[in-house]
Every structure is written in structure tokens, then in C-alpha cells.
């Protein structure tokens, strides 16, 4: 049993590994997103003066982590292929625990930005968990397993800001960072002692120059489609963020409730994703991951149109929740399609590229959303994002159709 599982690429301990990765990703995402509600206050405490400077430094400090993570994600994926993916999780959790604890001890804004960069370089627990689960779970269960993991990641990013609003008044901002470091250290211990990984497959000795991970992919079209779709998903999701609060101001009569309604709007999509991700992942295992990708993109494109014309904040909340339900299966399906179309030995390398593409979308989305909203109006952001999602659905349908036709022709010739 163990031998067969190793040869087929999955691990007989995959359920336990999934549970540890779920708990570890949930806890590390909580710790990583705790700072969102109080980051501007911390920046002000560190010496930033004036509203513009506080906002600017807060944006730089927050974005620094994503920028650094986008640069190194393929590297960590490649090293995971060579030396083991568990080792990458141990490295990430230990490095994040140290850097997060040190963040509570900084004395200047520059030190804060530097540590946020280091967290991005050293971190990547949730992305590493995605790679480990994708590569060591039976392929026929990968959609469900990745859906469960995605729910944990999304739940952590949803709970984190809520706790971040509660803890600083009770224990202080600096102590909150130290507590975050302690939580991540617990994830480090669980990862070290509980995760069991198949050893990396031995490499055949050859005098020929080894091919890069990308060169070893027999059919690159599905992988390119999923890299593009992952970037599009992150871009579309984040493009709305800069305008939500201002948009809600136009919808809510009682201006004292603007921040509350805006917070619910931002959380509604995440809640929908949590509820649907494992179910859609399981559905994709039955009906095909491509079908769920195309359907999710098409439904989200349709749901974005009425968001541009709502007249009440609760209408926007309902539509964002439905959109979260539709998008819940996208990330698990993207990872599963890539997993099904690459050799086992390059999984970390290619999935690292996928994670980098998503980080690019996370950085570019808010920039584009803010620019379009400022120059063409907020409705244009929703409508423009709808067009992008529709184009993504059409693109994936074309790639899927051509690939299916090509496979039929190959089967007929053989």
C-alpha cells in the first residue's frame, strides 16, 4: 500500500497532512491579517506624520509582503521539488514566527517595511500547503481536498481582521504581534511533528543538461490558461477593494454606518467562498475541473453587472455573497488542472509560478481599480471587471474545447 501510494504520487497520510495544513494555514492567515485594522495606527506610532504619509506608508508596508512573496514563490516551489515540501512549510512557519514577533519590536517605519519584506521572502505557508496537498493527494480527490484547504485559508483571512480589531485595545499593538508570532510557532511545531511526506523521487543520473520545470510539461496550454485565470481571479477580486467604502457611502443614508456596511460587503464574498469551496471542489472531481472554472467565471461575470446598479447596501452585500459562492471553487480547480497536466517532479516549481501570478493580480488589481474608479466612475470598475471575467470564461472554454478535440484525434490515430 505504501509503496503503491508513493509510486502513484500520493501519500497514505494525505488526510492527516490535509488536516495539519488546514489548521496551519488557518492560524497563520489569522496571524498575518491581524494587522489590517490597526496598521495605520501602528505606522502613526512609529513616526509617520499627516494623513497622506500614514496612508502611503501603510500601503507600502502591506504591499511589501505580497511583492516579496511573488518574487520567491517559484524558488520555494522548486526547492520543495528537490528537497521536500514539508521542509518548505517548516522553513516558512519558523521564519514567519520570528519575523512576526520582531515586527512588534520595531522603532521606525523603515524597520516595519523591512520586516514586512522579510515575511514575504521567508513566508508562504498557505501556498506551500497548497502545493503539498495538491501533489500528495489522490488526483481523484484533489478538488475536494484543495477546496477544504481553500476554505481554511479564506476563513483565516476573514477571522484575522476581526481579531485584529479586538486585541489591540485589550493587550496593545506590540503584544498583538508577539501573540501572532506565538500562534505561527505552534503551526511550526505541528508541521514539524505531524506532517508525513513521501520522500522526493530519486533523480535518474544523466549526462544531458537537465530540463527546466517548464520544459518538462508536455502540453503547456492548460497550464498557461490556469496561470492566466489565477491572475485574473486575484485581479478581479482585488480591483473592487479600493472603491468599496466610497461606493457604500453613496448607498447608505446613515453615514455613521458606512464602515460597518463596507466591512460586511468585504466579508460577504469571503463567507460565500468558505461555504462553497469544498462542495465545488468535490463537484469538480465528478464533472471536471474545466467545467467548474468556466461556469464560475461566467456566473461571476453576470453577478458583477447588477453590482454596478444597486441602490442599497444590502443589495450589494447579497450580490457579493453570491459571487463568493460562485468563485469558491476556482482556486482549487486551477490548482487541480495544473496538477493533472504536469509531471510529479516539477509540481512545486509550476505551482509556485501559479502563486506568483496570483500575487501579481493582487498587486495590479487595486491599482487598476483605483485608477478606473477615479477617472471613469465606480460603476466602470464593476462593469470592466465583468468584461474581464467573461473574457476569461470564453478563453478557458476555447482552450478546453481545442484540447478535448486534440485528445480525441490522438486517440483515433492510436
Q: Which residue stretches match the model-derived regions?
A:
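Helix-loop junctions on the cytosolic side of multi-pass membrane transporters
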Residues: 188-205, 398-409
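Central cavity-lining transmembrane alpha-helices of secondary-active solute carriers
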Residues: 60-76, 267-279
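Conserved MFS/SLC helix-loop-helix module at the cytosolic interface between two early adjacent transmembrane helices
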Residues: 70-107, 284-290
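Symmetry-related core transmembrane helices of the 12-TM Major Facilitator Superfamily/SLC fold
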Residues: 175-192, 382-397
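Paired small-residue
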Residues: 99, 110-118, 303, 314-322
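Short amphipathic helix-loop junctions that connect adjacent transmembrane helices
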Residues: 38-55, 243-260
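Cytoplasmic helix-loop-helix junction between adjacent transmembrane helices
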Residues: 115-153, 336-337
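Juxtamembrane intracellular "pre-TM" segments in multi-pass secondary transporters
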Residues: 2-14, 197-227, 413-414
Amino acid at each position: 500500500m505504501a509503496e503503491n501510494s508513493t509510486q502513484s504520487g500520493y501519500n497514505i497520510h494525505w488526510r492527516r497532512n490535509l488536516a495539519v495544513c488546514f489548521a496551519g494555514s488557518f492560524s497563520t492567515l489569522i496571524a498575518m491579517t491581524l494587522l489590517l485594522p490597526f496598521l495605520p495606527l501602528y505606522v502613526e506610532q512609529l513616526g509617520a506624520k499627516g494623513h497622506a504619509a500614514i496612508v502611503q506608508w501603510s500601503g507600502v508596508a502591506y504591499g511589501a509582503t505580497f511583492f516579496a512573496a511573488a518574487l520567491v514563490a517559484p524558488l520555494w516551489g522548486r526547492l520543495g521539488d528537490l528537497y521536500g515540501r514539508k521542509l518548505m512549510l517548516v522553513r516558512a512557519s519558523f521564519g514567519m514566527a520570528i519575523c512576526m514577533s520582531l515586527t512588534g519590536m520595531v522603532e521606525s517605519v523603515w524597520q516595519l517595511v523591512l520586516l514586512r519584506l522579510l515575511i514575504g521572502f521567508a513566508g508562504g505557508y498557505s501556498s506551500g500547503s497548497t502545493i503539498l496537498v495538491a501533489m500528495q493527494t489522490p488526483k481523484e480527490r484533489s478538488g475536494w481536498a484543495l477546496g477544504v484547504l481553500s476554505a481554511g485559508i479564506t476563513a483565516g483571512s476573514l477571522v484575522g481582521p476581526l481579531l485584529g480589531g479586538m486585541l489591540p485595545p485589550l493587550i496593545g499593538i506590540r503584544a498583538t504581534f508577539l501573540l501572532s508570532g506565538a500562534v505561527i510557532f505552534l503551526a511550526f511545531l505541528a508541521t514539524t511533528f505531524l506532517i508525513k511526506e513521501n520522500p522526493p523521487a530519486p533523480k535518474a543520473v544523466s549526462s544531458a543538461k537537465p530540463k527546466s520545470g517548464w520544459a518538462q510539461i508536455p502540453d503547456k496550454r492548460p497550464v498557461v490558461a490556469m496561470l492566466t485565470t489565477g491572475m485574473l481571479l486575484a485581479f478581479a477580486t482585488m480591483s473592487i477593494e479600493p472603491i468599496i467604502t466610497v461606493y457604500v457611502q453613496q448607498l447608505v443614508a446613515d453615514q455613521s454606518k458606512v464602515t460597518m456596511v463596507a466591512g460586511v460587503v468585504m466579508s460577504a464574498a469571503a463567507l460565500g467562498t468558505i461555504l462553497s469551496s469544498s462542495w465545488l471542489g468535490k463537484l469538480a472531481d465528478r464533472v471536471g475541473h474545466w467545467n467548474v472554472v468556466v461556469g464560475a467565471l461566467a456566473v461571476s461575470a453576470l453577478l458583477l453587472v447588477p453590482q454596478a446598479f444597486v441602490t442599497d447596501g444590502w443589495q450589494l452585500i447579497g450580490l457579493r455573497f453570491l459571487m463568493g459562492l460562485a468563485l469558491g471553487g476556482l482556486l482549487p480547480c486551477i490548482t487541480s488542472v495544473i496538477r493533472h497536466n504536469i509531471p510529479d517532479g516539477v509540481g512545486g516549481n509550476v505551482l509556485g509560478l501559479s502563486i506568483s501570478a496570483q500575487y501579481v493580480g493582487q498587486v495590479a488589481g487595486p491599482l487598476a481599480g483605483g485608477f478606473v474608479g477615479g477617472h471613469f466612475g465606480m460603476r466602470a470598475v464593476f462593469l470592466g471587471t465583468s468584461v474581464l471575467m467573461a473574457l476569461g470564461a470564453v478563453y478557458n472554454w476555447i482552450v478546453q474545447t481545442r484540447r478535448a478535440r486534440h485528445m480525441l484525434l490522438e486517440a483515433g490515430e492510436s
